[in-house]
Amino acid sequence: MAFPHRPDAPELPDFSMLKRLARDQLIYLLEQLPGKKDLFIEADLMSPLDRIANVSILKQHEVDKLYKVENKPALSSNEQLCFLVRPRIKNMRYIASLVNADKLAGRTRKYKVIFSPQKFYACEMVLEEEGIYGDVSCDEWAFSLLPLDVDLLSMELPEFFRDYFLEGDQRWINTVAQALHLLSTLYGPFPNCYGIGRCAKMAYELWRNLEEEEDGETKGRRPEIGHIFLLDRDVDFVTALCSQVVYEGLVDDTFRIKCGSVDFGPEVTSSDKSLKVLLNAEDKVFNEIRNEHFSNVFGFLSQKARNLQAQYDRRRGMDIKQMKNFVSQELKGLKQEHRLLSLHIGACESIMKKKTKQDFQELIKTEHALLEGFNIRESTSYIEEHIDRQVSPIESLRLMCLLSITENGLIPKDYRSLKTQYLQSYGPEHLLTFSNLRRAGLLTEQAPGDTLTAVESKVSKLVTDKAAGKITDAFSSLAKRSNFRAISKKLNLIPRVDGEYDLKVPRDMAYVFGGAYVPLSCRIIEQVLERRSWQGLDEVVRLLNCSDFAFTDMTKEDKASSESLRLILVVFLGGCTFSEISALRFLGREKGYRFIFLTTAVTNSARLMEAMSEVKA
């Protein structure tokens, strides 16, 4: 059921070293404040911290009590306070309020601020403005790479997407460069580098500068990873906006996977309690279904349950010695498998109930029509109905963005109509969100000259003038009216299928969207790796309106083993989806590669829309 790795598939590097490094550095920073201390942790850092150093480890290093950084007075009576925070101005104001309250009360304590993953000058300026810069000591916890799975690393920076792609804030690019530098220091240099997007290019150049400054560190080392590919999220918004239909993607869309784990509620656990479950390759049941199209999952779990029951039933014919062996060697594993199986069956049932209620099939049909460019009027009517029924502000916004990007912007009449209906249905407070979406290129209005009618009239005039040679040019400009359509055609993103697409035995990456669409980001990666360059993709790059780069260091490549040259690190700047991860895992199996994923954060369509929204849920 799961994609078995080919026998010749290369081994993955051991990324547990990154956890150990992060843990050791944090312990070192905590011990710089000897004695008992209270630790204030920002909410965003709680889940990543739990994966690195749990409460018992913190207690071993004299952390007395833990507090969440929030907008209310702290009740700590400890003489030493340590703050573990992101470099945000609101956090500096919070720390300043505590320190200044102590000053007013005539109380003297020791304060330490640990910034993660790095400190920014702006934060130090705020501490100075608040008059407490001399009262606190500042440090950095350079924790920027969290291994969520054997092949998935996350920087856990969901704000990267909004900060860079909406605000144009480049401060996190240095963090990305430092993370890449750490990887090349630990796992050897990367002989082949490719990338597309403005942010990717800046991160690459900054990283190369760091490499040149410390050239001695990786010199002479054998590369463990043969290729690195950097890609901006805005190169492919379409994939991120589509509903996910692979199991892991659906679990994320339905329950929200956070930092590699998910909270399953009572409707899944069949009890009155919620349960936090870690989703990774160690969960054997999950690992077999994570990359599968959802339509295959129930059948697999049913068969698994029958097999498990058969193993339990073997006990009946056992003698005492056999029973003893069974209890000591197999029973524990069977019970664990049974528990996991029950959870995933419960999750599937819950997903089915929610999706049936939402009329998921009709939604998928509309998305496929938008991707293929068919029945645009019907799809627009479906979106209008969605808005009128007030189904979900985020869902309606997502569908509007998908319509806009696949059609290279909405015609002015449709843009004004949909926007008016949306604001009337969900409230005028969403007006600023539309401004954000326009700035990010997610929801735009066509200029009058771009409309289909304008191009049609141009063609009509040429036909009347019998200017045969120019008719082809006019039709060509008509075809390129939507860059997505042109790119889709160039890269064959919409597979031509004779009969039913077999989701049980998929033949290409399109299976992650029910056979309707190959993720653009994944197709670009596939094409560049095949060519080992951007050669022959000039037209695609031009249509994407992005800068691309490729660099090969022959001396490093000569040192690399054939196995490491089949290991590819893909860096998503602005987030990647589980659908893209599943698609590239499939490609790896087909081509004999192994992909490793590094993302600023795992994302999905809802997170993308929430990042752009000015109305917080």
Curated annotation (Swiss-Prot):
Expression tissues: Ubiquitous; highly expressed in testis and low expression in the lung.
PTM note: Phosphorylated on tyrosine residues. (Microbial infection) Dephosphorylated by M.tuberculosis PtpA, which induces the reduction of host phagolysosome fusion in M.tuberculosis-infected macrophages.
UniProt signal peptide: none
Gene Ontology terms: biological process: collagen fibril organization; collagen metabolic process; endosome organization; intracellular protein transport; intracellular transport; lysosome localization; megakaryocyte development; melanosome localization
InterPro entries documented for this protein: Sec-1-like_dom1 (IPR043154), Sec-1-like_dom3a (IPR043127), Sec1-like (IPR001619), Sec1-like_dom2 (IPR027482), Sec1-like_sf (IPR036045), VPS33_dom3b (IPR043155)
Domain of life: Eukaryota
Subcellular localization(s) per the UniProt record: Late endosome membrane; Lysosome membrane; Early endosome; Cytoplasmic vesicle, Clathrin-coated vesicle
Pfam families reported for this sequence: Sec1
UniProt keyword annotation of Metal-binding present: no
Modified residues (N-acetylalanine): A2
Similarity section: Belongs to the STXBP/unc-18/SEC1 family.
Biological role stated in the UniProt entry: May play a role in vesicle-mediated protein trafficking to lysosomal compartments and in membrane docking/fusion reactions of late endosomes/lysosomes. Required for proper trafficking and targeting of the collagen-modifying enzyme lysyl hydroxylase 3 (LH3) to intracellular collagen. Mediates phagolysosomal fusion in macrophages. Proposed to be involved in endosomal maturation implicating VIPAS39. In epithelial cells, the VPS33B:VIPAS39 complex may play a role in the apical recycling pathway and in the maintenance of the apical-basolateral polarity.
Name this polypeptide is given: Vacuolar protein sorting-associated protein 33B
Taxonomic source organism: Homo sapiens
Gene that encodes it: VPS33B
